[in-house]
Amino acid sequence: TLAHERITATDAAPSRWLLVLHGIYGAGRNWASVMRRFVRQRPDWGAVLVDLREHGGSRGFPPPHTLRAAAADLDALAATLDEPVRAVLGHSFGGKVALVYARDFGRGLDQVWVVDSTPAAGTPRGSAWEMLAAVRRVPDRFETRAEAVAALEAEGISRPVGQWMSTNLIHGPDGYRWRLDFDVMESMLLDFFDTDLWPVVEAPPARVRIHFVKAEESAVLTEEACARIEEAGRRNGRVRLHRVAGGHWVNADNPQALEQLLVEYL
């Protein structure tokens, strides 16, 4: 099963789990501080920080590397938990995985949270796609992390994003190398861009409520998409859009706003 970490309030025995899904090139730990603060305020919930297939500690998963395969992995993980999964939150790439999980597997699911991700299909573009090209142009071994960050910077990647990406380097006898398989990452991203999940938003599974969180300084969720989400909510009464200040990495830029939303609506 997927590598994961369970987070609960001290001495709490939560009655339900929230699955937390990172973006491409990320790992479950990206969400640890937000979720620790959330469960302190809502000890009835526990959070499961998931490493999606071929990320973090989740290695050796067979192809195809698709959104549906990633969602099926979650279903297998949910079956091992002592309490039911009642909600799933996904950031960026993880947002689409969350929607596919709700559509195809999420028995007993009450809520889906899609954080700065779009349900729309489209041509591959944006920072994650640009990163794929950049890492293929730089060496696959480095003496230091700083050398890797500088190499990415020379390819047009901003220093903060390069520093974050360098957390995917592992140290061995011959220096630092990437622990991600970028061919697998490409397969996952191609499926992400190829998959249209508007039908899930416009006709959510029974009883499921969907919350979208748009980061105001990010272009991932266009105004056109926001209008369509709000229209879906007016029609079905189970979809809601929240706008928060911050860029795409809203869990780092504005964690307080996310925590407030989760405490209020979950």
What are the language-model segments listed below?
Residues L99-R103, L109-F142:
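Flexible "cap/lid" loop of the alpha/beta hydrolase fold
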Residues P173-R234, H242:
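Conserved serine/cysteine hydrolase catalytic core
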Residues R243-E259:
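Catalytic histidine-centered segment of alpha/beta-hydrolase-like enzymes
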